[in-house]
Every structure is written in C-alpha cells, then in structure tokens.
C-alpha cells in the first residue's frame, strides 16, 4: 500500500527539513520575543516561526504520506506540490521578516503567499477524502482538521490586513482568538486522527477504543461554540478536550505489548510532563516559562518522537526495501543513533526544568544542544537515501 500510494519522498523530506530550519530560527526568535505583550510583532514572529513554520511544516509533510495510508487511496493531486512548497517557504519567510522589520509590503506579500500556499494544500488535502474507502474516526477527524486549517489561515490573513493597513473597525481580539482556535484546531484534529492510527501501530496496543479521543473531538468543537460568548469558558472546554486526548494517549501507551521504554515513548511521556509544567507556570503567571515548556517542551518532544519512527520507516520502504534479498539491509532500529536520541531527550528535559525555574535564556541556549543531537539523527537517516548505490 505504501509503495502504491506514496508521494515522492523528496516532497515529504522537503517539508521536514524546512520545519527543522524554522525551528532553529524560532530558538533565536524566542530570545527577542516579549511575552508580556503577546500581540507585539516580535512575539508574533516567534509564534509564526514555531507553529506555522515548524509544527505546520512537519504536519503537512506527514499528511502527504499518511493521508494515503489512512484513506487507502492516492493523494488527490501532486501537481504543483513543489511549486506550492516554494510558495510556502517564501510566504512564511516573508511574513516573519515583515513582522520583524515592520515593513508593510513584506508583511502583505508574505502573508498573501502563505495564504495561497496553505489554501492550495488544504483544498487538495480535503479533495483526497472524496471516494475514500474508509470513513471512521481517523478520517473524520483529519477531514475536520483540513476545514479548520482553511478557515484559520483566512482569518490569519485578515489579521495581517488589520495589522498592516488597519482595515475597518474589526474586533481584533475576537479575530485573533478564532484564528488561534481554528489553526490550533487544525493541528489538534489532525493529531487526534493520526494518533488513533499510529499509536496502536507503534505501541502495539490494538485493543484501545479511543473513547476519550472522541470525547476530546466533541469538547473541542463545543469549545469553539462557547468562545463566541465567553473566551474563558470556551478555553475550559478546549482544555478538557486536550486533557481527554492526553489521558487516552497515556492509556494506549500503558496497554502496549512491549513494556520497554525507548526514545519514542519516553519523548511522548516527557512531552506530557512538559505540558503539565506549562500549565503550572501559566497558573502562576510565568508566561515566558509556560510558552517555553509548551513549545520547546511539549511540541518539540512530541514531534521528535514521531520523527524517529516515521522518517526511518519512509526511507526504508522507499530506498532500502528494493534491496531485500540482494544484500544485507539494516533494521529500522539500526537506522537510529540511540545515544544521540537519548542525549537529546536528556538535554531537552534539563532545558525545560531550568526554564521553569526562571532561567529561561539558559534553557534556550541548552535547547540548541538538544536540537543539534536531533539533527545528527536526521543526517544519519538521510544518509540511507543512497543505500545500495554501490551495488
């Protein structure tokens, strides 16, 4: 199925590599952000580098591959996919540069390019669901995620116009709230759907029904409806939805057949710990510390955990599997530098704990070290692309 429906690995790898480049830039942007003024251009630049640059780039790359697997059919179209990737890079780079330099023309150009790129991807992604062989929780959740993405980026461009040109008498705080809700919801629903497929696969816990995932789905939608009347109560619904997701994910990991711990499940457990630390910091008004634990803690650990599983898997099937029976081929686990993975995990843990104690800048610099060890593994993965070339 993978070989029948898979898009070119170069497209998926392009988004992954771009995501990590954006992450490196986000580390430095964090140092210049003012989290006491969350709507400042410097702060907005960091959030867009991290979420629209790193997180969304990884998600798009993964969706090009995983959508075909979940739906058991080819992605709707790959025409102009590479052009769209270039447009995405120009868009996010221009938008962030416009924010940092406060140049209206660059802000408009970058925001417009990013809007077109994400809408094109969102539409081709949603059209992939037409004629799907399976229609279950995973497909519904992933489809809703695509709808949320399109709505979210449109609201985001309206905010760009508001910032850059002061368009009309728009309710800025309401627009910002729903922009965050829809873009965050796109990520949340995609993660819900994909996790309901990947968690049983990677953890070998096939008897989990994911009832709390479904409750999380409903609570997040209800949270959006409540946001219209009250941001506070809407956030409570969304928070409970996220809590249900975490509980079910932990339950699935607890029910795994192989009880050993490795760089994958340890990163996931650490990610949930960082999310709890972020919530505690926010409760005590430590906004900068909370943002660090959420971004470079939870999201970083959660994404890296799955990178360790997904990228070797894709490279093995695209570049190594044709040589099975012809020469000795590596196992998936042999493709991962375990020492580098565990050092990155340990450094990331130290970073978050130090930052939570108030030494955020030190945590940021140490995070560069953790990121470096993750990149070492990425380089090792990519070296297998040339496997068998000497035969």
Segments predicted by a language model, with ranges:
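Hydrophobic alpha-helical transmembrane segments of multi-pass integral membrane proteins
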Residues: 1-391
């Amino acid at each position: 199925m993978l070989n029948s429906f898979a898009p070119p690995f170069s497209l998926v790898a392009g988004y992954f590599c771009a995501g990590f480049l954006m992450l490196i830039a986000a580390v430095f942007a964090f140092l210049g952000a003012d989290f006491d003024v969350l709507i400042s251009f410097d702060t907005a630049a960091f959030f867009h580098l991290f979420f629209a640059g790193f997180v969304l780039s990884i998600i798009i790359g993964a969706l090009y591959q995983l959508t075909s697997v979940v739906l058991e059919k080819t992605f709707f179209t790959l025409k102009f996919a590479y052009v769209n990737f270039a447009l995405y890079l120009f868009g996010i780079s221009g938008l962030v540069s416009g924010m940092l330099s406060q140049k209206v023309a660059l802000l408009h150009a970058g925001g417009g390019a990013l809007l077109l790129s994400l809408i094109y991807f969102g539409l081709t992604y949603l059209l992939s669901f037409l004629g799907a062989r399976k229609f279950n929780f995973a497909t519904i959740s992933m489809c809703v995620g695509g709808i949320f993405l399109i709505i979210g980026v449109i609201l985001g461009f309206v905010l760009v116009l508001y910032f850059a040109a002061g368009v009309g008498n728009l309710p800025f705080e309401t627009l910002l709230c729903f922009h965050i809700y829809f873009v965050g919801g796109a990520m949340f629903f995609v993660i819900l759907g994909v996790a309901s497929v990947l968690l049983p696969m990677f953890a070998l816990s096939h008897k989990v029904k994911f009832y709390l995932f479904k409750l999380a789905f409903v609570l997040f939608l209800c949270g959006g409806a409540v946001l219209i009347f009250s941001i506070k109560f809407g956030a409570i619904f969304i928070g409970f939805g996220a809590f249900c997701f975490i509980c079910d994910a932990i339950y699935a990991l607890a029910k795994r057949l192989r009880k050993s711990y490795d760089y994958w499940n340890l990163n996931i457990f650490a990610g949930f710990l960082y999310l709890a630390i972020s919530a505690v910091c926010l409760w005590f008004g430590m906004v900068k510390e909370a943002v660090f634990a959420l971004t470079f803690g939870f999201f970083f650990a959660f994404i890296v955990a799955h990178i360790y599983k997904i990228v070797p898997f894709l490279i093995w099937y695209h570049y190594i599997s044709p040589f099975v029976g012809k020469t000795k081929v590596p196992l998936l686990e042999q493709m991962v530098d375990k020492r580098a993975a565990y050092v990155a995990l340990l450094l990331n843990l130290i970073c978050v704990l130090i930052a939570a104690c108030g030494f955020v800048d030190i945590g940021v610099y140490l995070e560069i070290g953790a990121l470096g060890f993750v990149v070492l593994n990425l380089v090792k993965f990519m070296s297998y692309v040339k496997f068998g070339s000497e035969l």
